[in-house]
Amino acid sequence: MNNLSQIEALLFVSGDEGISVKNMSIITGFDRSAIQGLLEELVLKYDTDLSSALQIRESDDVYRLVTKPELGGTVKQYFDSPVNATLSQAQLETLVIVAYKQPITRVEIDTIRGVQSSGTLQKLALRQLVHEVGRKDEPGRPIMFGTTDEFLDYFGLKSIEELPPLPDFNMLDLGDDIDGELFTSAFDVHQSESEKENV
């Protein structure tokens, strides 16, 4: 395992939220100048490799691994294709958590689900079911996510207020012993009742 591959791995697992130079330094133990040099090397690697679909983007000292703009049409076709019309269980769980807890950060979603959610969030964003709604005022300024109008259309809702209530939801806190199943179970009941009403 070399230094370059460590930085590349961190960019990959951080997903759409990205990772700051400071956090890369904390995790790897490399100093800032070394990380900047490795990032420049990776940027050059992706930019000069015409067969690579990836590139590195930087914003506010946060770096992300993203697909190149010219491949946007191909990526859109993938998410618009019939084979991807149905949400996976992980996508549904993540989406419903965002709906109930928005605005919410990726780390907060991970806390509720108990697993890493960056890849799932990225797919939901590409399907335009969630989007960035701002940044949380805390170290690292993590991205906050919320649902979109496409989310409402997908589930046949007129507004976010039509989401079914969760039991004692206002009493819940991210520190409580809860998981994504709490959210999806309530939503599934609501969907079943709505389908019966439309028969």
Curated annotation (Swiss-Prot):
Transmembrane segments: none annotated. Coiled coil: none annotated. GO terms for cellular component: cytoplasm. It is found in: Cytoplasm. Pfam families: SMC_ScpB (PF04079). Keywords: Cell cycle, Cell division, Chromosome partition, Cytoplasm. Participates in chromosomal partition during cell division. May act via the formation of a condensin-like complex containing Smc and ScpA that pull DNA away from mid-cell into both cell halves. Belongs to the ScpB family. Homodimer. Homodimerization may be required to stabilize the binding of ScpA to the Smc head domains. Component of a cohesin-like complex composed of ScpA, ScpB and the Smc homodimer, in which ScpA and ScpB bind to the head domain of Smc. The presence of the three proteins is required for the association of the complex with DNA. This is Segregation and condensation protein B. The gene is scpB.
